[in-house]
Amino acid sequence: MPDDNGKHPSIWRHRDFLLLWGGQTVSEMGSQVTVLALPLVAVVLLEASAFQVGLLSAAETSAYLLVALPAGAIADRVPKLRLMIWCNLALFLVIGSVPLAQAVGALTLAQLYAVALVSSVFSVFFSVAYQSYLPVLLDRNQLMDGNGKVAVSRSVAQIAGPSLGAGLVALIGAAGAMAADALSFALSAGSLTAIRTRERRRPSAEADRRPGLWAQIREGLAYVTRDPILRNSVAFNGTANFFVIMVETLGPVFLIRTLHLRPALVGLLLALGAVGGVAGGVAARYLARKVGSARISWISMTVLSLPGLLIPLAGHGWWVLLFGFGWISWTFASTVAGVSLTTYRQAACPPDMLGRVSAAARWITWGTLPLGGVVGGALATALGVQTTLWIAVAGGCCAGLWLFFSPLRGMRDIPLGKPEPAPVGGKP
């Protein structure tokens, strides 16, 4: 809330936001440890085949398509803070079951599949509730800053998490590293429990008029398609994800098989993407203030992302740095745009619809990831890896046209006024 002078206090002095942000950062770091440790548990302890490890990866990534839409509707029905706490406690138990089963000699691949799927389901519920709860804590004029800090912590976790995971695996084994991740969720739950801010309770008469679960899901999808800025931003994210997964999948193949780089150098080049995410999260608020929060969203993806076209030009020797520069530029631009677009969704959407609207947007945008992976693999087989990378980076840069040809192009700043009321009943 503004102070007596009409100014908004620094977000660094916002106790509840710092507790939320800190708890999420700890669990993000732990989750990145598990990204490395879970397949190692399967390979090292259970001698899983490549196909079985692929099934494990599919179980980890399928939850958004399976439960994102009902998760959003449920998040709008229950207290979001309480939902996040229970999700963290559930993740503590689910992830913690792996080192416990390994200690008593009862660990199986079936359990790992179940852990991967169930933990991803709880992660989806947490993520939807988290994004919906942030506007409860922060004033609308603080959302850009808050979302930028969340993006920074996510990118830092992507950089430091795998290194931390590798160190923990070397020190205490893969199962022990998962025990550390389980502990991170317990710490996050404790941090959230200390938050004092509570959501406004829905009046009982209003709650009685609330439509059923599937009607609410339809409302969320309808809201996304009805709002022209949301509609174009979802189309942008879905298109960008479709192409970026091609780069993430085929980039290592290109660097190892075409340029014959050592795996350590490949990992370093790919990690630069997270560095770009950190820089984008830090710079998002400054660029929004100087250029305009609406204007920077489309400028970042139509102008600042253009060095991404250097990725397929990478060659031997120092020319390999073109890959790193292109990748860091692309992730910087997409993070800046993402912070602005997330802030718009949080500010424009009615609070009691934010969960299902966020879930609907993510269901659409994340749903293009498996499709992009399949299409990228097919194109690489037919046309070659480098040619497919050209298609991917060109398509990723063109994704910004969804934002250019949207109402954002006629605005300097995203509107942060009072959102339109949510519809009551089963019709959008």
Language-model segments: what does each one mean?
Residues 1-428:
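Alpha-helical transmembrane-bundle signature of multi-pass membrane transport and export proteins
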